[in-house]
Amino acid sequence: MSLSLLFNAPLHSIRKTRLYAFLLKSRLNRVRLSNLGLSFPVAIRPLTHASIRWRNNRLEPEITELFTQAIKALDRKDIDGQFFDVGANHGRYAWIAQSACPDMKVIAFEPDPENIELLELTVEHSKLEQVRIVATALSDEEGMISFHQDKLTSATGMIQDGETPWVEKYLGQKSRLIEVRRTMLDSYCTPESIPALIKIDVEGHEPEVLQGSAQCLQDHKPILILESFPPKLEQVVNFLTELGYEILDAERKKPLGAHTNNLFAWHPEGPLPESDIREILES
């Protein structure tokens, strides 16, 4: 192990060791409720989610702030819309939304059974009656599909699409291939369940998720915060632009550039007026 890498990215280096893989299966990594600075405790696995515990207030700070401002703006306007968390993982953004706006309804979509266990425990323990957990992947069709489960960090599980999973590419650890259910977001967009804000973090499956959300996006024009990397990024931008969305780099709040991988997208006819969007971007 390189000493420079150990000191510059210690957790990344430690995760590559056999000892860490052993400890993940030990009682040190049993599910527990932790205080992450929200209004209620959150279920995590201490070692699997070590980066969340150690870097919680510094984890995706620009995206977190943008998301929080958008959620609060929707709440202030008393917008009758929900938050759809697509690729919820252990629930970080769902819990931020619930902590900031307890009356807002949330649907958390997550296919990984180990993450689903955490989501359900948090909801049950804290009696989060506004949160609905849907144990499925979102895509552009119905049925079962193969899913690379990331048992090391739980954060980079992905639909099998021929690409090398992150945990294998960067940490040298094998993912576990499991079968999960998939469906389309349009199936959950009903008169009783209309999203005002959608967060999408699905490790390369964004084009398919958006295709399966096309009717909802056309009809209701929710605000979108999503992660995407080349070459999928161009597909995502083209798809949203054709629907009339405005798009900025979510981290920099500037036009898209060479380093863009997080998008903030809104429609001029969406749930918030342009003045509120500008206020969010200038905050």
Which residues does each PLM region occupy?
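Conserved acidic-Pro-Pro-aromatic motif
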Residues: 81, 101-108, 184-283
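S-adenosyl-L-methionine
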Residues: 1-113, 117-183, ...
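Short, glycine/charged-enriched secondary-structure capping and boundary segments
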Residues: 97-101, 121-124, 147-150, 162, ...
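Short, glycine/acidic-enriched loop or turn micro-motifs at the edges of active sites
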Residues: 88-90, 113, 140, 202-204, ...
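Short N-terminal helix/helix-N-cap motif within the alpha/beta-hydrolase-1
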Residues: 92-95, 117, 143, 207-211
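Short internal loop-to-helix segment that lines adenine-nucleotide cofactor pockets
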Residues: 55-84, 132, 161-220, 231-235
